[in-house]
């Protein structure tokens, strides 16, 4: 029987607790500095202690994972710590589609896939000189919002970019992505596509809390205008959200379109968990500005099951447990090749 492995960060506790609930062995690749934390949790069967997560690329670590018939569950830390080439070189079977993680990390590829899926998107801005209205500037990959900033025009862009460079938040040669800012209620829509059942499941919705942009509302406008600090969009945590029921049909349609587009563009497609991220405007119209092609940290708020998964399963079902069940079913039916790459 396969075991479940992941990096000790992001959503690893949820992933491994779900795997243990499904009766699978659990393995955590853990940095030394976090060993004390993860030793607290009895559902973690084995810790592989490393100095840096990049050691998962080493033959020694991959050999240990192979001996345990491990399936590696990717999350945001894997993408943030390693290049797409490095992730694709990992010999350990990766749950889902490791090739699509490159499309998540590269902004231009990401935009292409979202357009193929006919997701409504903000207008991209190809050059700072073309900023005509409030825009948001983003880094490549899974940066967790750190180093993002807003700009009203080219001068504003250059001032804030230079300040973040001087503070060491971004590098001078870093490629930044600009898109017009979409205002509304933040909604991060999480799905699970099962290649075994060929079925899409809507898991739930969360909102992300970002510092220190969320704290600015408590500062009087006079003091805000005198401050030279560039606000940060660093994600600190998440909270649950339940949508109006009338919005759910469109939610499923967007998820299905994304799955089908992924099959056409980056085989074998969007298998496993993914998230379409955006905002609802005053007319309840959704605009999508991102996608994540793997489990997201927002799923941590539903470790006892989400409202929408409670409608599909007559048991407590976290995303970690859902992943483990897919792996377990695939292993029992000799179909692991359908759920891993």
UniProtKB/Swiss-Prot annotation:
The keyword ATP-binding applies. The lineage of its organism: Archaea, Nitrososphaerota, Nitrososphaeria, Nitrosopumilales, Nitrosopumilaceae. Gene3D superfamilies: 3.40.50.20, ATP-grasp fold, A domain (3.30.1490.20), ATP-grasp fold, B domain (3.30.470.20). 5-amino-1-(5-phospho-beta-D-ribosyl)imidazole-4-carboxamide binds at residues 10, 77, 238. It holds the Pfam family DUF1246. ATP binds at residues 132-188, 210. GO terms for molecular function: ATP binding; ligase activity, forming carbon-nitrogen bonds; magnesium ion binding. Catalyzes the ATP- and formate-dependent formylation of 5-aminoimidazole-4-carboxamide-1-beta-d-ribofuranosyl 5'-monophosphate (AICAR) to 5-formaminoimidazole-4-carboxamide-1-beta-d-ribofuranosyl 5'-monophosphate (FAICAR) in the absence of folates. One of its GO terms (biological process) is 'de novo' IMP biosynthetic process. Binds 1 Mg(2+) or Mn(2+) ion per subunit. Residues 106-317 form the ATP-grasp domain. It comes from Nitrosopumilus maritimus (strain SCM1). Mg(2+) binds at residues 277, 290. This is 5-formaminoimidazole-4-carboxamide-1-(beta)-D-ribofuranosyl 5'-monophosphate synthetase. It is an enzyme of class 6 (ligase). Its EC number is 6.3.4.23. It catalyses: 5-amino-1-(5-phospho-beta-D-ribosyl)imidazole-4-carboxamide + formate + ATP = 5-formamido-1-(5-phospho-D-ribosyl)imidazole-4-carboxamide + ADP + phosphate. Its cofactor is Mg(2+); Mn(2+). Keywords: ATP-binding, Ligase, Magnesium, Manganese, Metal-binding, Nucleotide-binding, Purine biosynthesis. Belongs to the phosphohexose mutase family. Transmembrane segments: none annotated. SUPFAM superfamilies: Glutathione synthetase ATP-binding domain-like, PreATP-grasp domain. InterPro entries: ATP_grasp_subdomain_1, IMP_biosynth_PurP, IMP_biosynth_PurP_C, IMP_biosynth_PurP_N, PreATP-grasp_dom_sf. Pathway: Purine metabolism; IMP biosynthesis via de novo pathway; 5-formamido-1-(5-phospho-D-ribosyl)imidazole-4-carboxamide from 5-amino-1-(5-phospho-D-ribosyl)imidazole-4-carboxamide (formate route): step 1/1. It comes from the Archaea.
């Amino acid at each position: 029987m396969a075991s479940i492995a992941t990096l000790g960060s992001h959503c690893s506790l949820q992933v491994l607790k779900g795997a243990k609930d499904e009766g699978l062995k659990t393995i955590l690749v853990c940095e030394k500095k976090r060993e004390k934390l993860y030793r607290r949790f009895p559902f973690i069967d084995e810790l592989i202690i490393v100095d840096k997560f990049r050691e998962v690329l080493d033959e020694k670590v991959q050999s240990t994972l192979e001996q345990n018939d491990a399936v590696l569950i990717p999350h945001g830390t894997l993408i943030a710590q390693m290049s797409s080439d490095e992730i694709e070189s990992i010999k350990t079977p990766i749950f889902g589609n490791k090739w699509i993680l490159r499309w998540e990390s590269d902004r231009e590829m990401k935009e292409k896939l979202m357009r193929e899926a006919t997701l409504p998107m903000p207008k991209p801005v190809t050059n700072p000189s073309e900023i005509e209205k409030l825009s948001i500037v983003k880094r490549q990959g899974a940066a967790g919002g750190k180093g993002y900033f807003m700009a009203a025009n080219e001068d504003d862009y250059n001032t804030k970019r230079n300040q973040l460079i001087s503070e060491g938040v971004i590098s001078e040669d870093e490629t930044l992505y600009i898109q017009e800012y979409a205002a509304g209620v933040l909604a991060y829509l999480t799905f699970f596509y099962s290649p075994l059942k060929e079925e899409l499941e809507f898991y739930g919705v969360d909102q992300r809390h970002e510092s220190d942009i969320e704290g600015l509302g408590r500062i009087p406008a006079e003091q805000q205008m005198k401050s030279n600090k560039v606000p940060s969009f660093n994600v600190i945590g998440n909270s649950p959200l339940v949508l109006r029921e009338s919005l759910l049909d469109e939610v499923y349609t967007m998820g299905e379109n994304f799955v089908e587009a992924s099959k056409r563009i980056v085989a074998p497609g969007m298998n496993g968990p993914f998230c379409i991220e955006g905002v609802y405007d005053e007319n309840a119209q959704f605009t999508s500005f991102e996608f994540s092609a793997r489990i997201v940290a927002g799923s941590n708020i539903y470790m006892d099951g989400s409202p929408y998964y409670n409608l599909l399963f007559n048991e407590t079902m976290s995303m970690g447990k859902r992943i483990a069940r897919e792996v377990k079913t695939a292993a029992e039916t000799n179909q692991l090749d359908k759920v891993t790459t």
